[in-house]
């Protein structure tokens, strides 16, 4: 079972991101404040759940959470500030949108850029340790998946419906054959074979 909180006395928000390693699309983050007595045996790291389970849990989280929000950073912004800073910014934007102000942030990972006036704790593999981070992981992933599925309708040859923008062979072959889209992150090694510089000339 995942832990319900780090500090029972504080209003805690769990934060996580999705899409950091993708070649295309925005990075998404979510922040979730759960009730102190929240329990759900299925809730776990979103990567270990089926797609059907993630979407079912999203409904539960949105219904039962004290507050939840999603933050988005565009591919253009990612290229300007780099993906690490973009991940932090997406989490900041999610926290900005929470209707209840948290007193403490639980961050998945080992690094974070401090949010103004709210202390934080980073937790390595936190989505497998704390309920609120696991909940944030599910919201970030499912909302980003919805977004990539919509982009797939516009550019079906990149197979975003299945790869969600991650660097699969089919995705990279489509980039080599069809070029890039406005949704590709141009500062990333899109072809993965050292040929990006030649490709972009």
From Swiss-Prot:
Task: Please indicate if the UniProt record lists Aminoacyl-tRNA synthetase as a keyword.
Answer: no
Q: Which residues bind a divalent metal cation?
A: 16-17, 108
What single Pfam family name could you report for this chain, choosing any that match? Answer: RNase_HII
Query: What EC number(s) are associated with this protein in UniProt?
Result: 3.1.26.4
Keywords of this entry? Cytoplasm, Endonuclease, Hydrolase, Manganese, Metal-binding, Nuclease
The cellular location(s) given in this protein's UniProt record come to: Cytoplasm
Cofactor: bound how, per the entry note? Manganese or magnesium. Binds 1 divalent metal ion per monomer in the absence of substrate. May bind a second metal ion after substrate binding.
Q: Which residues form the RNase H type-2 domain?
A: 10-200
Substrates-to-products reaction catalysed: Endonucleolytic cleavage to 5'-phosphomonoester
Cofactor (UniProt): Mn(2+); Mg(2+)
Q: Which Gene3D superfamilies match?
A: Ribonuclease H-like superfamily/Ribonuclease H
Which Gene Ontology CC terms are recorded? cytoplasm; ribonuclease H2 complex
Q: Is the Nucleotide-binding keyword given for this protein? A: no
GO:BP terms for this protein?
DNA replication, removal of RNA primer; mismatch repair
- An MF annotation (GO) of this entry: RNA-DNA hybrid ribonuclease activity
The record's NCBIfam families line, in alphabetical order, gives: PRK00015.1-3 (NF000595)
Q: Which family does it belong to?
A: Belongs to the RNase HII family.
Its job: Endonuclease that specifically degrades the RNA of RNA-DNA hybrids.
According to UniProt, the name of this protein is: Ribonuclease HII
- Native source organism of the sequence: Bacteroides fragilis (strain ATCC 25285 / DSM 2151 / CCUG 4856 / JCM 11019 / LMG 10263 / NCTC 9343 / Onslow / VPI 2553 / EN-2)
């Amino acid at each position: 079972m995942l832990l319900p909180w780090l500090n029972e006395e504080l209003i805690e928000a769990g934060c996580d991101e999705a899409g950091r390693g993708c070649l295309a699309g925005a990075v998404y983050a979510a922040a979730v404040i759960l009730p102190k007595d929240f329990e759900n045996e299925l809730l776990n790291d979103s990567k270990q759940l089926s797609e059907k389970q993630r979407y079912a849990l999203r409904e539960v989280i949105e219904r039962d959470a004290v507050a939840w929000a999603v933050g988005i950073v565009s591919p253009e912004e990612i290229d300007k500030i780099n993906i690490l800073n973009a991940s932090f910014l997406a989490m900041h934007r999610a926290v900005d949108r929470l209707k209840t102000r948290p007193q403490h942030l639980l961050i998945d990972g080992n690094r974070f850029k401090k949010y103004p006036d709210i202390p934080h704790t980073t937790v390595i593999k936190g989505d497998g340790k704390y309920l609120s981070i696991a909940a944030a992981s599910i919201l970030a992933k499912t909302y980003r998946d919805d977004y990539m599925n919509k982009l797939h309708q516009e550019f079906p040859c990149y197979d975003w419906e299945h790869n969600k923008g991650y660097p699969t062979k089919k995705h990279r072959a489509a980039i080599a054959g069809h070029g890039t889209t406005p949704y590709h992150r141009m500062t990333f090694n899109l072809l993965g074979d050292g040929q990006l510089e030649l490709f972009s000339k």
